Amino acid sequence: ADVFIYVGGESDAWVKTVLDGVDNPNLRVVTLMDCVELLDEETVEGMQTEKHDHDHAADDAEPDEHVWTSPRNAARICQKLADTFAAADSVHAAAYAQRCGDYVEKLNQLDAEFQDVVEHAARKTVVFADRFPLRYFADAYGLDYYAAYPGCADAAEPSAATVAFLIDKVRAEGIPVVFTIELSNGKLADTICEATGAKKLEFATCHNVTAQAFADGATYLQLMERNVQALREALN
């Protein structure tokens, strides 16, 4: 390979061993987490934290790996990739630059749509009856959030305290939408919605897609455009 791309962080700790064994001095490595300003994964009020799939103490903060969830970060990542491809394949450098510019323009438009939704919203709080791998997204648009688990948690059955907290929060703040993320079973969201009358909607983290969505050619931009509409409904 000429270029090796990976996210980085605890989940990709195995990559270093692989790269250490590669005899290719010309290999260019891009770590997505090196492309952006990192934020630590955080635990917010009401969040269940007993189970976690990373080997670190509960009190040890680690960087959130889901850097692509902010369109602004996605633009930075695209620029780094384009620069790396151009360096590895200089004959086509102009083409990489052009395509990157075109795509970043679309990402900037997406960013503007999210900003508009938040600026004209009736509230700035979202509720996720699920894991919350959207720290960068929430930070980019000044959103407050409540969720069942941190972004990298092993989402087992939620505790009664977590369920009760989220139900109370939705009722108290009149939250109209409770989010799940892709490939979630949605059971916790169903419980909260049944208790509060809120509506269950999916918010795509662009981390996973179904086999059918992949076959249909789902893209980051398509998934994020759906998120624009879902967020508009959740904040109004």
Predicted regions and their residues:
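Extracytoplasmic metal-acquisition and chelation regions
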Residues: 1-236
